[in-house]
């Protein structure tokens, strides 16, 4: 049986996306030394997600870490090498998180790190920046 939950938040980068969730309890960075530019594999040894791929996933994390170089890394992964995530959900989206030109949502009516689990199917509907967005979470029991 599936469980479905809908959360409302604010679109920080517009678009629609869906994919399997990858949830990091730790702050997350997009530099080439954190997520490989050509494979999308996480190479942050201190992160429990080390070795997993962000490709085609909805990545959920508290907020970004690292320098503004991460914005170039995220853009490259999403738009050039095509190994980036399809969307981002954060407690607090930083300007770095919108550089990938993929949907990014924060300001949710619940804590995304508590509501979304790795493996859940997540759909983002973020049609206009600064306006309400919805996140639909589907969990198979």
Where would I find each of the regions flagged by the language model?
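Feature captures the catalytic cores and cofactor-binding loops of soluble hydro-lyases/lyases
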Residues: 2-17, 21-134
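Secondary-structure transition/turn motif
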Residues: 136-141
């Amino acid at each position: 049986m599936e469980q479905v939950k809908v959360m409302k938040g604010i679109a920080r980068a517009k678009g629609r996306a869906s994919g399997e969730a990858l949830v990091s309890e730790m702050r997350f960075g997009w530099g080439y030394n954190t997520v490989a530019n050509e494979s999308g594999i996480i190479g942050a040894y201190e992160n429990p997600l080390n070795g997993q791929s962000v490709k085609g996933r909805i990545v959920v994390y508290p907020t970004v870490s690292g320098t503004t170089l991460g914005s170039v890394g995220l853009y490259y992964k999403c738009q050039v090498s095509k190994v980036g995530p399809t969307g981002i959900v954060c407690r607090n989206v930083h300007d770095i998180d919108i550089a990938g030109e993929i949907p990014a949502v924060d300001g949710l009516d619940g804590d995304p790190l508590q509501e979304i689990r790795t493996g859940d199917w997540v759909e983002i509907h973020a049609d206009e920046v600064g306006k309400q967005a919805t996140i639909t979470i589907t969990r198979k029991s």
